[in-house]
Swiss-Prot record:
GO molecular function, one term: structural constituent of ribosome
Matches recorded under Pfam families: Ribosomal_L35p
Lineage: Bacteria, Bacillati, Bacillota, Clostridia, Thermoanaerobacterales
GO CC annotations, alphabetized: cytosolic large ribosomal subunit
Biological process according to GO: translation
Gene this protein is translated from: rpmI
Protein name: Large ribosomal subunit protein bL35
Naturally occurring in which organism (per UniProt): Desulforudis audaxviator (strain MP104C)
UniProt similarity note: Belongs to the bacterial ribosomal protein bL35 family.
Alphabetical list of Gene3D superfamilies matching this protein: 4.10.410.60
Length: 64
């Protein structure tokens, strides 16, 4: 049976942590930033851990 291919788009967006969780960048920080507060933009700069429901899908896209 052939190996499962890694979804290259997902591989670029999600990184697996040592404990098996996935971290990714927040949305809403690429444009239209003038109306967003400095506090909101600062918080969006940090990475965040995906929820359990999303992890199931990402694990299928990034098997290795």
């Amino acid at each position: 049976m052939p190996k499962i291919k890694t979804h290259r788009g997902a591989a670029k967006r999600f990184k697996k942590t040592g404990t098996g969780k996935f971290r990714t960048k927040h949305a809403f920080l690429s444009h239209i930033l003038e109306k967003k507060s400095a506090k909101r933009k600062r918080r969006l700069r940090k990475k965040f851990v995906l929820s359990a429901g999303d992890v199931r899908r990402i694990r299928a896209m990034i098997p290795y």
